[in-house]
């Protein structure tokens, strides 16, 4: 899997640009790549920005439901609970072990 244009992918995830995120995923960006400068995953960053649609898209494309994002030191499920994103919490609760 390619890192591709990870910075643009990460920015699109944070901005909630579902179509641009999909474009980068289709181009082979590693969905679980940790941003080298921000030390965060796109999934946790999108969750923290309250981007439920992006978070669900990332999960649909194989984002790990258990990968701890280094900067935040939390799993996607922990981040979704903190952000009160019920749809994302429900999806992650089915996929991840209890935390």
Regions found by a protein language model. Name each.
Residues 40-74:
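Ankyrin-repeat and related helical/solenoid repeat scaffolds used for protein-protein interactions
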Residues 10-45:
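Alpha-helical adaptor scaffolds
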């Amino acid at each position: 899997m390619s890192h591709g244009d990870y910075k643009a992918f990460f920015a699109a995830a944070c901005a909630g640009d579902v179509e641009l995120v999909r474009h980068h995923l289709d181009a082979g960006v590693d969905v679980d790549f940790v941003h080298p400068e921000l030390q965060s995953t796109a999934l946790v960053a999108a969750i923290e920005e309250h981007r439920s649609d992006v978070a669900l898209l990332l999960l649909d494309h194989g984002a790990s439901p258990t990968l701890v994002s280094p900067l935040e030191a939390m799993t996607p499920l922990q981040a979704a609970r903190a952000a009160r994103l019920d749809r994302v919490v429900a999806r992650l609760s089915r996929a991840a072990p209890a935390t």
